[in-house]
């Protein structure tokens, strides 16, 4: 071996006295670049992991925000759906009420229409009756009531007995004279719904002070009873009036309504 063989010298240096090579130094030298590379890789991996953790945290926060936003949107949507359902329910109820109202109004309108048609028919009938009445000459003048053989008129104003007598005479009539229970019942029915007093043609005067009709005939006994006090102190005498079906005696000077009476023209009615 010569000095010019450096490899041989290196091999000699690497050999142990027993002829074996010292591998520890050589191995450490060979693994140093690998260790550095591994350290760099570990550092890069650590940085990567840190970056991933940071990104994961950001993503997690973003997901939480999105979930919160989604939850909020779901709450809003649920509220809108609930409000829409309530609105639909209210609309259905309103529609139902409106339908019932329309049906009720239609029913009332139908009833009104029927009543209107009935009134129209009655109006036509009334026109026919009035037309016939205009051409009919009855036993009593217009505005007089006919009962059996007599005509009766109820005054529209109140006067004393003497003035009421004059009014009846001007109508070619006389104050009421009741000759029968049937006639009394008729008069009672005619004034049943009135509370006013009506003069009759019955009075009590000097010198006899007995109840006499205008024609001088006396009152038929037991035909009706006269209530009230009879006084001879009345200058105009005591006169009779009928009120609510009962005959009363009173001062002739007082005012009351009256009932005029005259014979019906039965020949004209035939």
From Swiss-Prot:
Query: What membrane topology term does the record carry?
Result: Lipid-anchor; Single-pass type II membrane protein
Annotated Gene Ontology cellular components are: extracellular region; membrane raft; plasma membrane; receptor complex
Indicate the segments forming the C-type lectin domain, all copies.
Answer: 147-261
Matching entries from SUPFAM superfamilies are given as: C-type lectin-like (SSF56436)
Q: Where is the lipid attached (S-palmitoyl cysteine)?
A: 42
Q: Name one GO biological process term.
A: inflammatory response
Q: Where in the cell is it found?
A: Cell membrane; Membrane raft; Secreted
- What tissues is it present in? Highly expressed in endothelial cells, aortic intima and lung. Expressed at low level in other tissues.
Is Membrane found in the keyword set?
yes
SMART domains per the record? Answer: CLECT
Relate the outcome reported for changing residue 263 to A: Impairs the binding to oxLDL
Record text about domains: The cytoplasmic region is required for subcellular sorting on the cell surface. The C-type lectin domain mediates the recognition and binding of oxLDL.
Briefly state the protein's biological role.
Receptor that mediates the recognition, internalization and degradation of oxidatively modified low density lipoprotein (oxLDL) by vascular endothelial cells. OxLDL is a marker of atherosclerosis that induces vascular endothelial cell activation and dysfunction, resulting in pro-inflammatory responses, pro-oxidative conditions and apoptosis.
The subunit field of the Swiss-Prot or TrEMBL record says: Homodimer; disulfide-linked. May form a hexamer composed of 3 homodimers. Interacts with HSP70.
Name of this protein: Oxidized low-density lipoprotein receptor 1
Naturally occurring in which organism (per UniProt): Bos taurus
């Amino acid at each position: 071996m010569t000095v010019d063989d450096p490899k041989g010298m290196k091999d000699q240096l690497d050999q142990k006295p027993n002829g074996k090579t010292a591998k520890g130094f050589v191995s450490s030298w060979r693994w140093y670049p690998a260790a550095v590379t591994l350290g760099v890789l570990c550092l890069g991996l650590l940085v990567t992991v840190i970056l991933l953790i940071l990104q994961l945290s950001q993503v997690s926060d973003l997901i939480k925000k999105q979930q919160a936003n989604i939850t909020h949107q779901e709450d809003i949507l649920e509220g809108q759906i609930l409000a829409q359902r309530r609105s639909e329910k209210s609309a259905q109820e309103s529609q139902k009420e409106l339908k019932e109202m329309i049906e009720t109004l239609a029913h009332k309108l139908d009833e009104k229409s029927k009543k209107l048609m009935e009134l129209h028919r009655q109006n036509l009938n009334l026109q026919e009756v009035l037309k016939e009445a205009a051409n009919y000459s009855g036993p009593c003048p217009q505005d007089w009531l006919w009962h059996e053989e007599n005509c009766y008129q109820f005054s529209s104003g109140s006067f004393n007995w003497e003035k009421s007598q004059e009014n009846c005479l001007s109508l070619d009539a006389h104050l009421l004279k009741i000759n029968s229970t049937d006639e009394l019942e008729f008069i009672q029915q005619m004034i049943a719904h009135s509370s006013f007093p009506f003069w009759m043609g019955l009075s009590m005067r000097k010198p006899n002070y007995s109840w006499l009709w205008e024609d001088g005939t006396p009152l038929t006994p037991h035909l009706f009873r006269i209530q009230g006090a009879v006084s001879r102190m009345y200058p105009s005498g005591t006169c009779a009036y009928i009120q609510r079906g009962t005959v009363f005696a009173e001062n002739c000077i007082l005012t009351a309504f009256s009932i005029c009476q005259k014979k019906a023209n039965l020949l004209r009615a035939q």
